[in-house]
Amino acid sequence: MAQTVQNVTLSLTLPITCHICLGKVRQPVICINNHVFCSICIDLWLKNNSQCPACRVPITPENPCKEIIGGTSESEPMLSHTVRKHLRKTRLELLHKEYEDEIDCLQKEVEELKSKNLSLESQIKTILDPLTLVQGNQNEDKHLVTDNPSKINPETVAEWKKKLRTANEIYEKVKDDVDKLKEANKKLKLENGGLVRENLRLKAEVDNRSPQKFGRFAVAALQSKVEQYERETSRLKKALERSDKYIEELESQVAQLKNSSEEKEAMNSICQTALPADGKGSKGSEEDVASKNQGDSARKQPSSSTSSSSHLAKPSSSRLCDTSSARQESTSKAELNCSKNKDLYQEQVEVMLDVTDTSMDTYLEREWGNKPSDCVPYKDEELYDLPAPCTPLSLSCLQLSTPENRESPVVQAGGSKKHSNHLRKLVFDDFCDSSNVSNKDSSEDDISRSENEKKSECFSSPKTAFWDCCSTSYAQNLDFESSEGNTIANSVGEISSKLSEKSGSCVSKRLNSIRSFEMNRTRTSSEASMDAAYLDKISELDSMMSESDNSKSPCNNGFKSLDLDGLSKSSQGSEFLEEPDKLEEKTELNLSKGSLTNDQLENGSEWKPTSFFLLSPSDQEMNEDFSLHSSSCPVTNEIKPPSCLFQTEFSQGILLSSSHRLFEDQRFGSSLFKMSSEMHSLHNHLQSPWSTSFVPEKRNKNVNQSTKRKIQSSLSNASPSKATKS
């Protein structure tokens, strides 16, 4: 077998073609280098040449070509028929012997396995049924009894019976326990299945539930609050440390002053004992000594105040020793003239107290005046106000009035500006009227006041279009993109200050309502985010209702001529600019009408959003005049309940989005502020109490129609949910 395998592998590795005839190899022959040739071809070649035709190796009788036996199947026909029969016979005999040997081995294995199987079955029966064992033992005992009846005693039989009873009882108990455990196992399996199903159901609900919309914002708000509280605690700790150091310095200074006063008193007592007993001379000398003491104390106090650090380095034990020795000397030497020294002692105490007060003031001025470098590193960390939009008022009003906090207002403005910029990263928080946000741009306002005056003059020129602007208390809370936004906000603040002087009662009532609203605003940012989502849904419903109402109204048929409307509005704007006195009268009328509606606002109605457009002076070429209507009537200016928010009135988000698109088309730059949809909804919730608007007396129907058309065109940008759907 191994020989045939070797031949087969060799024949498979050899090439099939001959190198001489280039045909199929017949009776293959190989040279030393294993080149294959036909035997006939190599014989013909060796008649003329004694070298291999492929590798030129000499072929001699010592190194002849070797024949391959069994290389191909052409050698098989060479065998005769009888030889082939014998070969087949031998092959069959070999196979038969092999199969018989295998059958014998398998039969032996089967017998062994049967015997093992029987033994295992008997073991299983004995384990599962112990009674059979007992019965088998009893049968054996019976056989033994029958064989040897005289050998077994009745006592042994009684003992075995007792053992059998105990065994049966134990078996029954174990069986009952097994049944109980099976029932408990079934119950646990059922409970496990129910819990698994409930777990799967909860997982499916969690997978199907939409992700929380404001989860990230709530986490960011909480993180900012934690950082803010940590900064506040660090600031308070540092302030306490500084106050402790300051108190220690003051105590050391007081101890020094006491030591100096006691030393001076001891010296005075010594001088008094040394003086003669004359009354007049003693009084004169006492007065001289007192005057000298005053001069010495007045001279020594500044030096002690300037060198307080060197006195602080001295140990307290030496001071105590000095004071104790001075006291002993003063008591021993002042016993003689006790009655005479009382008045002088009182005068000296008064003089020393006055001197200490002056020296304390000078010490404070020099001590805190010489520390500008100590105050600088705390400017960015502690010297800004920390009340956030959502912090409680009790924590936001905390401030330690240490001497380092009494800095220039420029430093405080810088610190508060940095802090407000840090807090304005979160868009969805409520607007607040805290001092740090309102004083944020104080330095920028001082720097760019000249630009404000120039731009206000440009705005008041008769060439510009009519400006409808309303004063809001939240004007400084909004982020403008460029310096033009800041200057325009300042001009609007000046107009609001003028209007607030004319409407005192209305402003006071609205300020009271805002103050009460700010005091009650202690909610967390997560609740504010949920309110924002709720307001988005309400704005969607209102916009759908307004679309349905506007589709039914007959005013939708005449909205095709925008240029004519723009021309009429520009002519009206020029008339308004020619008559500034009339504008002031109209503003007074609007303020009086707004004050009449305070009762409605106090009864629970929310403030309406009246946005203002801040246009550049180069808006002469624009055809349309952006004027706001608080109602559909062109004469009256009434504040309506929240149900009419999107029907006959501009919301702030609509006006901002439409105006921003128009400004980008006209290439006037980014002069309006950018606000996200959450800030629009929150600002609609926190309405401004300073809502006043210039409304002209003469308005055409085309103006109202254009406003309604603007509402319909920009309702899709009112809420963030509709924007995401589109």
UniProtKB/Swiss-Prot annotation:
A zinc finger (RING-type) spans 18-56. GO terms for molecular function: chromatin binding; ubiquitin-protein transferase activity; zinc ion binding. GO terms for cellular component: chromatin. Its EC number is 2.3.2.27. Auto-ubiquitinated. Residues 274-335, 687-726 are annotated as: Disordered. Residues 280-290 have a biased composition (Basic and acidic residues). Residues 300-320 have a biased composition (Low complexity). Residues 321-334, 702-726 have a biased composition (Polar residues). Keywords: Chromosome, Coiled coil, Metal-binding, Phosphoprotein, Transferase, Ubl conjugation, Ubl conjugation pathway, Zinc, Zinc-finger. Residues 87-129, 155-270 form a coiled coil. CDD domains: RING-HC_RNF219. Associates with ORC complex. Binds to chromatin; association is cell cycle-regulated, absent from mitotic chromosomes, is associated with chromatin from G1 and partially released from chromatin from mid S-phase. This is ORC ubiquitin ligase 1. The lineage of its organism: Eukaryota, Metazoa, Chordata, Craniata, Vertebrata.
